[in-house]
């Protein structure tokens, strides 16, 4: 191992820990070593924090002895402002009302508190001026643009040491604009005529953006023919009016304000503080158009009459995106609905224009108008119950010629349970949801009917005989149904028990676990409606599905199929024979055995 090797140990929570510690020290007077007195009010503080946050306190503590506590009397600061300043220095933020904001900022300026005084802005401005002075005119894009424009109509030069006072002038001598502030800075003087003035204006705009960023200019307002950038700072202003004609223009970077006026003749002054005001006119129309496009992106320039909809990259925000055309996206629900309607009746659907009016799991009921299922209904049932189709596809009773009669009886019984209502979907949406999710709710004994059953002749024109109740009664009266099948079908009053007493708000009970559904005939509570329906069918209606191989009965068809596949594998194998037979023959033998067992169980 190299003895010169070193490990860097870093604490990621160092800054946050210091901030929390300073906040705790502000709340308590622990380890305080300096006393601040303001109009008789005493504040205890720490020299280290005061010196770190205030240049004036740092200079004061360097010149005072360090033995014992020291007392500092502040005459020009009120107790409220001092308390707010201490909170700002210890926590980094403070809430000040609008009325006390001016006096608070003056106190911070006198104590040179970092983050509140303009000393930071002055230092940033000086560094920017030194950087601009070190660069040659051709090193920056502004300098190259100035030289290019000066070749067409004028010349410009950089003169350090100028005094920038807020002076501005218009082309006609009638417009005037006052700037804020005075101070030593950078002066750009040039013989400007036409393009030369535009170059000076471009240089002024570049300097303005740099100084505005350092001075934290936040308030912007615009007017026709002029853009005003305003801030809060103290300074000295002035006004100047220039005459028309070609002459020399001066650009000065001065104190705490920015004021600029432009024409073919007149000085333009830029300040380095937080306030700014510049009037654009004459040959500075391009810069004015860019500013107007920033303030009004959808409009055009008000003075030049030229439409300018493109936002320059320098004025674009961070999250700017160019406008794009809206793309038309077709909903997948409409395509699915159209495909489903074509499968049903070969025409487009006009019953449900959107998935909001009709859920995707909706299955139209055609029991009141037709006794034979359509192809779309058969496909829908196979998709909804893949497990049931696994057993039914190999059954002779469903693949024989009387399969349509079996399906019609299933639909009759199911429609009877739904009270034979064609508009049941509008009355109770939960009935539809349970119909789509409850795979195998129909009685298995209907499927295991006699193989020699033939469908009844179509009814007459009498509409009353097409209802499920009437059809079922006619089948029983004609003796078409076998005795065991007719006995297995529950009476109409028992089949209608659920629809006769539909669930309403009175059936729900609020418990500690939430809202529960209460059975209409007993005190059992269920969290889901499907479980309550199964309970009513099993306990109160007596509808149960028997196993064809044993004595057990079940509530749902899926449960019977899983039970047969799990418990009666050997019976299915014995029924198929000792020799190896194809899979469809074994399934047919198992279905025949199940039908025989069901018939024996239902015989009196």
Curated annotation (Swiss-Prot):
GO annotation terms (biological process): eye-antennal disc development; import into nucleus; male somatic sex determination; mushroom body development; negative regulation of protein phosphorylation; neuron development; positive regulation of actin filament polymerization; regulation of stem cell division
Effect of substituting residue 88 to I: In chinmo-M33; mushroom body neuroblast clones contain increased numbers of late-born alpha/beta type neurons and fewer early-born gamma type neurons
GO function term, MF aspect, one: zinc ion binding
Low complexity bias spans: 364-374, 461-470
Expression by tissue: Broadly expressed in the developing larval central nervous system (at protein level). Expressed in the larval lymph gland and circulating hemocytes (at protein level). Expressed in all cell types of the adult testis stem cell niche but not detected in somatic cells of the adult ovary (at protein level). In the testis, expressed at high levels in cyst stem cells and early cyst cells and, at lower levels, in germline stem cells (at protein level).
SUPFAM superfamilies listed in its UniProt record: beta-beta-alpha zinc fingers, POZ domain
Ranges of biased composition (kind: Acidic residues): 425-437
Assigned keywords, A-Z: Developmental protein, Differentiation, Metal-binding, Neurogenesis, Nucleus, Repeat, Sexual differentiation, Zinc, Zinc-finger
Composition skew (Polar residues), residue ranges: 384-409
Database matches in Pfam families: BTB (PF00651), zf-C2H2 (PF00096)
Cellular location(s): Nucleus
Stated role: Required for morphological differentiation of postmitotic neurons during postembryonic brain development. Ensures production of appropriate neuron subtypes within a lineage by preventing precocious generation of late neuronal types of that lineage. Acts as a downstream mediator of the transcriptional activator Stat92e and is required for the development of the eye-antennal disk which gives rise to the adult eye, antenna and head capsule, for transcriptional repression of the Notch receptor ligand Ser and for the self-renewal of cyst stem cells in the testis.
UniProt name for this protein: Zinc finger protein chinmo
Gene that this polypeptide is encoded by: chinmo
């Amino acid at each position: 191992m190299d003895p010169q090797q070193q490990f860097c140990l870093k604490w990621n929570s160092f800054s946050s820990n210091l901030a929390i510690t300073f906040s705790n020290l502000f709340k308590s007077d622990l380890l305080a070593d300096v006393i601040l007195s303001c109009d008789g009010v005493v504040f205890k503080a720490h020299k280290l924090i005061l010196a770190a946050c205030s240049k004036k306190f740092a200079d004061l503590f360097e010149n005072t002895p360090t033995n014992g506590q020291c007392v500092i009397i502040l005459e020009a600061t009120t107790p409220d402002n001092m308390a707010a300043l201490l909170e700002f220095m210890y926590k980094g933020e403070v809430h000040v009302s609008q009325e006390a904001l001016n006096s608070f900022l003056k106190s911070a300026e006198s104590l040179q508190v970092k983050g509140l005084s303009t000393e930071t802005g002055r230092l940033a401005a000086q560094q920017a001026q030194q950087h601009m002075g070190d660069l040659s005119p051709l090193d920056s894009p502004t300098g190259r643009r100035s030289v290019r424009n000066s070749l067409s109509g004028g010349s410009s030069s950089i003169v350090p040491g100028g005094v920038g006072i807020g002076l501005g002038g218009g082309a006609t001598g009638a417009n005037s604009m006052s700037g804020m502030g005075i101070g030593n800075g950078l002066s750009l003087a040039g013989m400007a005529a036409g393009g030369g003035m535009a170059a000076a204006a471009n240089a002024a705009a570049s300097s303005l953006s740099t100084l505005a960023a350092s001075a934290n200019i936040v308030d912007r307002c615009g007017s026709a023919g002029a853009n005003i950038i305003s801030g809060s700072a103290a300074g000295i202003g002035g006004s100047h009016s220039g005459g028309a004609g070609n002459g020399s223009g001066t650009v000065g970077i001065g104190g705490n304000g920015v004021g600029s006026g432009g024409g073919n003749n007149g000085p333009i002054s830029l300040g380095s503080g937080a306030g700014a005001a510049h009037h654009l006119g004459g040959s500075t129309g391009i810069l004015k158009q860019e500013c107007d496009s920033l303030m009004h992106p959808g409009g055009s320039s008000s003075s030049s009459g030229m439409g300018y909809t493109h936002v320059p990259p320098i004025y674009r925000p961070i999250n700017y995106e160019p406008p794009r055309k809206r793309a038309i996206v077709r909903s997948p629900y409409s395509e699915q609905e159209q495909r489903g309607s074509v499968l049903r009746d070969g025409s487009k659907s006009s019953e449900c224009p959107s998935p909001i009016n009709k859920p995707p799991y909706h299955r139209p009921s055609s029991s009141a108008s037709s006794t034979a299922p359509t192809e779309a209904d058969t496909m829908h049932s196979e998709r909804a119950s893949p497990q049931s189709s696994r057993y039914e596809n190999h059954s002779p009773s469903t693949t024989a010629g009387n399969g349509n009669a079996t399906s019609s009886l299933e639909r009759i019984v199911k429609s009877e349970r739904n009270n034979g209502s064609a508009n049941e979907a509008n009355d109770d949406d939960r009935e539809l949801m349970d119909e789509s999710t409850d795979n195998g709710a129909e009685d298995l004994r209907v499927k295991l009917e006699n193989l020699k059953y033939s469908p009844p002749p179509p009814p007459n024109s009498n509409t009353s005989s097409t209802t499920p109740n009437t059809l079922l009664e006619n089948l029983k009266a004609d003796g078409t149904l076998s005795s065991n099948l007719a006995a297995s079908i529950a009476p109409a009053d028992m089949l209608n028990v659920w629809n006769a007493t539909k669930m309403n708000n009175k059936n729900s009970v609020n418990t500690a676990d939430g809202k529960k559904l209460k059975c209409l005939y007993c005190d059992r509570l269920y969290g889901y409606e499907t479980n309550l329906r199964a309970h009513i069918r099993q306990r109160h209606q007596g509808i149960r599905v028997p196993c064809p191989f044993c004595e057990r009965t079940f509530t749902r068809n899926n449960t019977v199929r899983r039970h047969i596949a799990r418990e009666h594998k050997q019976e299915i194998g014995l029924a198929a024979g000792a020799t190896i037979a194809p899979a469809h023959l074994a399934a047919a033998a198992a279905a025949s055995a199940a039908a025989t067992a069901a018939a024996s169980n239902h015989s009196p």
